[in-house]
């Protein structure tokens, strides 16, 4: 239902625009630290890219990413087991974090992968066919070897965002405003005074834009040009016998992910088509073909669902995290591209460290907005 008109000009210490996994984790950390937070979401919390993704808690091929992304993903990877357990205990909703490892099939840059693993201390190893088919009996036949990362896990996105929302809704210092679309900003002398919404103006001491694919459009209203664009990704879900697929398997840039209820998710596409979220027959066929190439037995299984989401694309996939130049109280955390859920724990912690004046967990320089904004001027 539409957001009800605000009776007062709400004021919180922190005002967050965008209720995806980035916005909700930021809210959780600020509230945990004893601060009041208002979270504005144009629809329902966690129902855009955060809901639509696959939930692999790693970049698909981590050795192909730049150091700034690797640093965020490495920090985040160890956070999810603890977060999932906390949310289950506090909300009764199991985000279904499962650490069963990941198999990489037909990797064409294996030397680079192994060199990366040695450099960062990851337990990536080359395994033979016996090992591969013992771990994944239904994998495509005829493979001589694979790469195996035993520490990687996955989480079920819809359950994660549901648990985060439930936890925030129970926190007295948090105000959730859903179906509450931002229509503009009031600003003066380099300070955001209020955020105008369909329910009226809302004020906060510090304003944080976590708008995902919509972040650029929001900031344009303040004449800030952030190079973030929507990139569509489509996925399908198979209804399968329990145990058909045992763990995440990745081949030729596509993947299959088993769920606890026996279903198998297959993804994903990369499409530059603006804000169009239409799920298309061509993408469905392409995803089906890729999934069947990985696990041939999926050809006999029903495709139960097919959907699309919009990723926040950015140059090189490195997110923008930190203060917006020219404003005293405006910050952003956006542009995570394919790795929003992967990078969320570290990127939100990095921003919260800056907001609260703490020693940051990582060097903030690679994520600052100043260079990006200068290049678009």
Where are these regions (language model features)?
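N-terminal Rossmann-like FAD-binding beta1-loop-alpha1 element of flavoenzymes
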Residues: 12-39
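Dinucleotide-binding Rossmann-like beta1-alpha1 core, especially the glycine-rich loop
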Residues: 56-135, 290-292
């Amino acid at each position: 239902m539409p957001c009800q008109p605000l009776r007062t000009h709400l004021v919180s210490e922190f005002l967050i625009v965008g209720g995806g996994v980035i916005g909700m984790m930021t809210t959780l950390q600020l509230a945990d630290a004893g601060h009041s937070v208002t979270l504005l979401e144009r629809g329902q919390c966690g129902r855009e890219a955060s809901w639509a993704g696959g939930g692999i808690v790693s970049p698909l091929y981590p050795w192909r990413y730049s150091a700034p992304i690797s640093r965020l993903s490495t920090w985040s990877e160890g956070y999810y087991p603890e977060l999932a357990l906390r949310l289950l205990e506090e909300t009764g909703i199991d985000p279904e974090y499962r650490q069963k490892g990941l198999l990489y099939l037909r990797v064409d840059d294996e030397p680079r992968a192994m060199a990366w693993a040695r450099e960062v201390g990851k337990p990536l190893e080359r395994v033979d066919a016996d090992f591969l088919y013992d771990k994944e009996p239904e994998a495509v036949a005829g493979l001589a070897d694979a790469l195996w990362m035993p520490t990687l896990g996955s989480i079920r996105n819809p359950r994660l965002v549901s648990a985060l929302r439930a936890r925030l809704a129970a926190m007295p210092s948090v105000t959730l405003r859903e179906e509450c679309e931002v229509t503009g900003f009031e600003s003066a002398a380099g300070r955001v005074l209020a955020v105008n919404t369909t329910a009226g103006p809302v004020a906060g001491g510090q304003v944080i834009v976590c708008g995902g694919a919509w972040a650029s459009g929001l900031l344009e209203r303040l004449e800030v040009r952030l190079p973030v664009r929507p990139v569509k990704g489509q996925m399908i879900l198979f209804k399968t016998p329990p145990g058909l697929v045992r763990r995440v398997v990745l081949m030729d840039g596509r993947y299959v992910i088993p769920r606890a209820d026996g279903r198998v998710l297959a993804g994903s596409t990369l499409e530059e088509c603006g804000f169009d979220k239409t799920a298309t027959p061509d993408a469905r066929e392409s995803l089906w073909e890729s999934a069947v190439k990985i696990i041939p037995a999926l050809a006999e299984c029903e495709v139960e669902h097919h959907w699309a989401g919009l990723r926040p694309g950015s140059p090189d996939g490195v997110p923008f995290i930190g203060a917006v130049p020219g404003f005293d109280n405006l910050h952003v955390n956006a542009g995570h591209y394919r790795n929003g859920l992967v990078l969320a724990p570290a990127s939100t912690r990095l921003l919260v460290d800056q907001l609260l004046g703490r020693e940051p967990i990582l060097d903030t320089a690679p994520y600052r907005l100043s260079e990006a904004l200068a290049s678009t001027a």
